């Protein structure tokens, strides 16, 4: 009886091993830093940080004697996002007060992020989170529906020029803090049929997020 040795066996085994390694490494469900980073970046790419906690509608009117109401709008006038006009408003039968009327400029309309749920409402958004590091994650599995708590650091990407202006940052302290440097955040990720996705995003002191 002649026995034929399979000289290609080690080579075949090596190929199978490499294929398995690549399949695991490229699997979106794999529990690794790259997939967590991608999930968080994808979520915040569609949920930028904005000036106001709730969408607002222009035009708006503010009493000129109340700088807490006018300073923010005036800073946006300086950046060309709003136009300002003055008027007198009747306060009592024989009295009146000076008010400023603010409305979107052409530049402001192009920078405006409209609210899809409230026609006419919107916000000025100034960037989105870009993960710089995944600091920790709780143990999880590759099963669909599994969750993990992720702690990470990020910086705001794609900030427009108006957001970097000193007047704007003075009028909006949260904007200044967001653009000052790296921030820390936390998120709950859920393993879905399409890979890891953000399911809960606890506040970490960052800017208002458009949902």
Predicted regions, residues:
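Mixed-charge, low-complexity intrinsically disordered segments
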Residues: 106-121, 159-181
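Accessory beta->alpha helical hairpin/"wing" motif in late/C-terminal subdomains of nucleic-acid enzymes
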Residues: 85-125
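Post-signal-peptide N-terminal segment of Sec-exported extracytoplasmic proteins
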Residues: 42-75
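Bacterial N-terminal signal peptides that target proteins for export
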Residues: 2-14
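C-terminal motif of bacterial Sec signal peptides marking the signal peptidase cleavage site
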Residues: 22-25
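Basic amphipathic alpha-helical segments that dock to polyanions
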Residues: 68-83, 87-88
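Short beta-strand edge/turn micro-motifs at domain boundaries
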Residues: 83, 149-161, 177-211
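Bacterial lipoprotein signal-peptidase II cleavage site
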Residues: 27-32
């Amino acid at each position: 009886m002649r026995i034929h040795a399979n000289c290609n066996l080690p080579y075949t085994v090596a190929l199978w091993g490499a294929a398995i390694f690549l399949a695991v490494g490229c699997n979106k469900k794999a529990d690794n830093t790259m997939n967590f980073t991608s999930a968080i970046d994808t979520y915040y790419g569609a949920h930028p940080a904005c000036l106001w906690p709730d969408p607002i509608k222009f035009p708006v009117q503010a009493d000129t004697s109340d700088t807490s109401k006018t300073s923010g709008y005036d800073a946006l006038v300086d950046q060309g996002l709003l136009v300002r006009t003055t008027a007198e408003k009747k306060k009592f039968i024989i009295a009146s007060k000076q008010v400023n009327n603010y409305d979107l400029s052409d530049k402001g309309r192009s920078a405006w992020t409209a609210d899809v749920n409230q026609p006419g409402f919107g916000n000025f958004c100034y960037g989105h989170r870009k993960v710089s590091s995944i600091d920790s994650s709780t143990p999880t599995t590759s099963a669909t529906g599994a969750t993990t708590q992720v702690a990470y650091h990020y910086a705001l990407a794609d900030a427009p020029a108006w957001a970097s202006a000193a007047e704007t940052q003075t009028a909006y302290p949260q904007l200044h803090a967001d653009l000052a440097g790296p921030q820390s955040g936390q998120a709950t990720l859920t393993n879905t049929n399409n890979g890891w996705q953000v399911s809960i995003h606890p506040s970490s002191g960052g800017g208002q997020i458009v949902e």
